[in-house]
């Protein structure tokens, strides 16, 4: 298997086998549509070889599926789902239907709870910040979320205050604003 990819005469026989070595890559094993000139397909984790996820018809580039999906010379397949691809975050949880949520990405790490339903917050990634399908940015303090911000100040009406209600201010599902003075309840 190894020898079939090596030598002065290259053959497609054995190309893509996991036994092929880096020095055995040859142009005859390549597909010109998406692979580099010195790689074979389907490939494995050999540096000079094409990654199979880079050779999808919907997102074919010289080096990998989509340029923004590339970290150094390695392609992350989870970046290239359906029609969405993120430049800084490559976790599948960042994709909802066909829409990527860049604001769900903190540095190089994705927080999936940012991408619930149709809401996504840049600063806060806790599920407790969500009421129905609406995120509440005012519920977020630094990296911590205060769920008590997201109560219903008027019974039957969904809203959120910039100040934080304390659980003690709540009767049933309706907080009592008069209970809250400054930051103390």
UniProtKB/Swiss-Prot annotation:
Its GO CC terms are: cytosol; keratin filament
Does the record carry Hydrolase as a key word? no
- Where do the record's region annotations for 25 X 5 AA repeats of C-C-[IKRQVHEC]-[SPRT]-[STCVQPR] lie? 14-164
Q: Which Pfam families match?
A: Keratin_B2_2
- Provide the free-text tissue specificity comment from this protein's UniProt record: Expressed in the hair follicles.
Provide the residue intervals of the sequence repeats. 14-18, 19-23, 24-28, 39-43, 44-48, 49-53, 54-58, 59-63, 64-68, 69-73, 74-78, 79-83, 84-88, 89-93, 94-98, 99-103, 104-108, 109-113, 114-118, 119-123, 124-128, 134-138, 139-143, 144-148, 149-164
Q: Is Kinase among the key words of this record?
A: no
Q: Which InterPro entries match?
A: KAP
Going by the UniProt record, its keywords in alphabetical order are: Keratin, Repeat
* GO biological process terms held by the UniProt record: hair cycle
Q: How does it assemble?
A: Interacts with hair keratins.
Q: What does this protein do?
A: In the hair cortex, hair keratin intermediate filaments are embedded in an interfilamentous matrix, consisting of hair keratin-associated proteins (KRTAP), which are essential for the formation of a rigid and resistant hair shaft through their extensive disulfide bond cross-linking with abundant cysteine residues of hair keratins. The matrix proteins include the high-sulfur and high-glycine-tyrosine keratins.
> Which protein family is named in the record?
Belongs to the KRTAP type 4 family.
Query: What name has this protein been given in UniProt?
Result: Keratin-associated protein 4-8
Origin organism of this chain?
A: Homo sapiens (Human)
| Name of the encoding gene | KRTAP4-8
